[in-house]
């Protein structure tokens, strides 16, 4: 996978999972890859099967120079808005790295406020290995967390849709109302609450 941007020093790739769902946290990951220990098969997490993502997540944890995963809670999403909560989760992930990054590449078109140079790369999770690695860690950690929430709130089917807006999720919202882990600032949830 080509590194399209000329990075500075130790580069961390940053990506998130969970901006679009109606429930659960938004999760971000930051990864500094080891050029001496390349990882074959890195790609945008959405283009990989669950089995492949899980296998790659293990390899990333073993081979990366450093990695960290952080989240912004449903309460933070509702208080700040999803964009600001996503930036907060990204900042937390970078701050949690065991090795200090010297620059950052982030998937998308906005960078979080960091104390290192940062460049946003549109569709970076399909272009830059460290962002792809962050995409995979963020997605696998968020999915695991949604399975925990499914055990607490089984009526909503989080194990199937991970909180994303699906017909089944809308039907569950209509039947059961919003759970404590639903994002009240999101239109479909707010509309459901207004009907109660």
From Swiss-Prot:
Pfam families: RNase_HII
UniProt KW Nuclease keyword: yes
Listed GO CC annotations: cytoplasm; ribonuclease H2 complex
Location within or outside the cell: Cytoplasm
Catalytic activity: Endonucleolytic cleavage to 5'-phosphomonoester
PROSITE patterns, A to Z: RNASE_H_2
Names of the cofactor(s): Mn(2+); Mg(2+)
Keywords: Cytoplasm, Endonuclease, Hydrolase, Manganese, Metal-binding, Nuclease
Record-level GO BP terms: DNA replication, removal of RNA primer; mismatch repair
Binding-site list for a divalent metal cation: 15-16, 107
Matches recorded under InterPro entries: RNase_HII, RNase_HII/HIII, RNase_HII/HIII_dom, RNaseH-like_sf, RNaseH_sf
Cofactor: how and how many bound: Manganese or magnesium. Binds 1 divalent metal ion per monomer in the absence of substrate. May bind a second metal ion after substrate binding.
Span of domain RNase H type-2: 9-196
Enzyme Commission no: 3.1.26.4
Superkingdom of the source species: Bacteria
Gene Ontology MF terms in the entry: manganese ion binding; RNA binding; RNA-DNA hybrid ribonuclease activity
Enzymatic class: hydrolase
PANTHER family hit by this protein: RIBONUCLEASE H2 SUBUNIT A, RIBONUCLEASE HII
Recorded family membership: Belongs to the RNase HII family.
Functional summary from the UniProt entry: Endonuclease that specifically degrades the RNA of RNA-DNA hybrids.
UniProt name for this protein: Ribonuclease HII
């Amino acid at each position: 996978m080509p590194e399209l941007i000329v990075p500075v020093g130790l580069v961390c790739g940053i990506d998130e999972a969970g901006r679009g769902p109606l429930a659960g946290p938004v999760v971000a990951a930051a990864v500094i890859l080891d050029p001496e220990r390349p990882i074959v098969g890195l790609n945008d997490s959405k283009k990989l099967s669950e089995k492949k993502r899980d296998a790659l997540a293990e390899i990333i944890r073993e081979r990366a120079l450093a990695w960290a995963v952080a989240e912004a809670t449903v309460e933070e999403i509702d208080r700040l808005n999803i964009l600001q909560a996503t930036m907060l989760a990204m900042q937390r992930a970078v701050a949690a790295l065991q090795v200090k990054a010297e620059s950052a590449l982030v998937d998308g078109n906005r960078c979080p406020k960091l104390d290192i140079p940062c460049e946003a790369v549109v569709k970076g999770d399909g272009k830059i290995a460290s962002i792809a690695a962050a995409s995979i860690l963020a997605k696998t950690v968020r999915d695991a967390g949604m399975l925990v929430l499914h055990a607490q709130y089984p009526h909503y089917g989080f194990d199937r849709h991970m909180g994303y807006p699906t017909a089944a999720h809308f039907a569950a919202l209509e039947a059961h109302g919003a759970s404590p882990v639903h994002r009240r600032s999101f239109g479909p949830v707010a509309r459901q609450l207004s009907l109660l």
